[in-house]
Amino acid sequence: MPKRVVVLGGGSGGTIVANRLARQLDQQVREGDVEIIQIANTEKHIYQPGYLFITFNERQPEHFIRKQDQLVHRNVKLIYDNVTKIEPEKNLLISKKNQYPYDYLVIATGSVPNFDSIPGLAEAAYDFYTLEGSIRLRDALAKIEKGKILLTIDVPHKCPAAPLEITLMLDDYFRKRGIRDQIELVYTYPIGRIHSLQPIADWATPQFEKRNIQYETFFNLERVDPEKKVAITMDGDEHHYDLLISVPAHQGAPVILNSKLGDEDGFIPTDRYTLKMEGSNNIYVVGDATNLPISILTYTA
């Protein structure tokens, strides 16, 4: 029987790993000693860094969408299924209809924004971390002529630079439309500077000041009143807005939470040097599924 390597996840990290294994183990695959399987929960591969370009109508959604089977190496067996549980003690993946044994597993299930973490947030906020969210925000921005845009950020979240990026892009977007003086941009962050990394905060702060972008630190959102359009912080401060853009705290994929492999937020304890799941000799973790405190981008996943 060939050794079976299963890559769980069809995003950038999982696809890169599957393709690299397919090339490096080409001979073993052709000789039947190794089998490489990628399990994706959708036939569509969406390039997530493109969401910001969709938000500002610089590209249409289809520009960032490919069929997953067009992106994987011929040595990779591609399966579309929604795995709901991982059982490491049995070397087994489970879905509603199938079971997938493995000898080695690479978990590349990413992370997702948790809009339910703050009462009222799901009903009130716009986002740019999902395809649907970026389209919805694009349409909302196109209708704005004046008012206050409030950006709230919670941690952890993927792509650490994205909140700063969208804020600067909003400034540019409204300047190009000739209505920047009618728009109040307010950026918030939960700690004592506008980014978790000091060098980035040191660079971004004067950029905000030069562009008349207001910012508020130690801003920790507690709840949102969608009807009154008010964001309330843990300190009890009320902030009115005309449009709320939120980066909520992210959490691990449902399969990780369901399998109890991660911490309370569903991020998997991972050895930073080997990328092995802590306590395992045959499970590896890449990208946003790990609990590693580093900036994770597509090209570092």
Task: Annotate each predicted stretch with a short phrase.
Residues 33-37, 76-93, 174-270:
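A Rossmann-like FAD-binding core segment of flavoenzymes
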Residues 1-4, 76-165, 172-178, 245:
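FAD-binding core/adjacent interface of flavoenzyme oxidoreductases
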Residues 10, 97, 109-110, 235, ...:
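Glycine-rich, N-terminal phosphate-binding loop of Rossmann-like dinucleotide-binding domains
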Residues 2-76, 156-195:
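Beta1-alpha1 glycine-rich phosphate/pyrophosphate-binding loop at the start
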Residues 121-145, 238-301:
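FAD-site-proximal beta/loop scaffold in flavoenzymes
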Residues 38, 78, 125-127, 215, ...:
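Conserved beta-strand scaffold positions in the cores of enzyme catalytic domains, especially
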Residues 45-48, 114-117, 254-255:
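Short acidic/His/Gly/Ser-rich catalytic and metal-binding motifs that mark active-site loops
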